[in-house]
Swiss-Prot record:
Monomer. It is an enzyme of class 2 (transferase). This is Ribosomal RNA small subunit methyltransferase C. Pfam families: MTS, MTS_N. Disulfide bonds: none annotated. The lineage of its organism: Bacteria, Pseudomonadati, Pseudomonadota, Gammaproteobacteria, Enterobacterales. One of its GO terms (biological process) is rRNA base methylation. GO terms for cellular component: cytoplasm. It catalyses: guanosine(1207) in 16S rRNA + S-adenosyl-L-methionine = N(2)-methylguanosine(1207) in 16S rRNA + S-adenosyl-L-homocysteine + H(+). Specifically methylates the guanine in position 1207 of 16S rRNA in the 30S particle. The gene is rsmC. It is found in: Cytoplasm. Belongs to the methyltransferase superfamily. RsmC family. It comes from Yersinia pestis.
Amino acid sequence: MSALTPASEVILRHSDEFIARHVLFAGDLQDALPAQFDAAGVRVHTNQYHHWQLLSNTLEENVQFGLLATAETLAACDTLIYYWPKSKQEAQFQLANLLSILPVGTDIFVVGENRSGVRSAEEMLADFAQLAKIDSARRCGLYHGRLDKQPEFDADAWWESYQVGGVTVKTLPGVFSRDSLDSGSHLLLSTFNEPFKGSVLDVGCGAGVLASVLAQQSPKIKWTLSDVSAAAIEASRATLAVNNIEAQVIASNVYSDIKGRFEMIISNPPFHDGIQTSLTAAEMLIRGATAHLHVGGKLRIVANSFLPYPALLDAAFGSHEVLAQNGRFKVYQATVGRPPRDPKKKR
């Protein structure tokens, strides 16, 4: 994430516009542009923990991680630069939150790759700001307008839920598999045939569906759930609460904030960061797993069959097995073996 994205390069084409402004960056920001941006003031609201990590050393208290922006973070900001995310519903949720706090007259810049659906920004915000396209470059569009009216925003109204067996799953915009259980997670769950116990880490927990379903089958599991998405963290907490399941839920960029070792790590790892294909998280998950598993501990993941995970698993663990597969997905498992005995050490 060190290089600038095409969307940020489009913003820099208009850098003179922002020199005297107090700018708030928000949305699917994936680079360090705010840390080097020339403006009278720069603040960032992000709901992605790894983006917060990237920027916090430089911007310190001027970057906020969380589901909802606060009036304190947005104080004194007169300009919003919003990066359009992959999910239209997520854009609606975030912009409704931001524009309900920013004062009337705030300049709004919306930027995003054309394939992300940024063109729909004009229609989406029509009741609150009249946006017009002011630039098109690098397969991106940049739109500008001023806030004419603040929208009403009630975070509780954005919650949705669905059922998986006897489990109620609570979800928010931007959370993976918001509307129903995805087929990859379904295949992963099908490989748990017997009750088990011990400590289990769910990396990239989404709405907490894996832990909640497995907790019904194996109530003695000690769960830790993690995700980079603030929406996923809140959704997981809500799912666990409504199903009366106790677990620790934390923000972590794969293992960045994980303490201790586990009997098992499970995951349906993402291979996108926003709309960009990225195997970084999955590679970190596999390569770092042995440092977070007990001897005999297992990493069990589901992934699209075409992704190059077998070689990564073999490099990290020495071997792997395929527990289940269908036309699209495979469930892989790898086990931490005992280290070879050093023949030089005395018995």
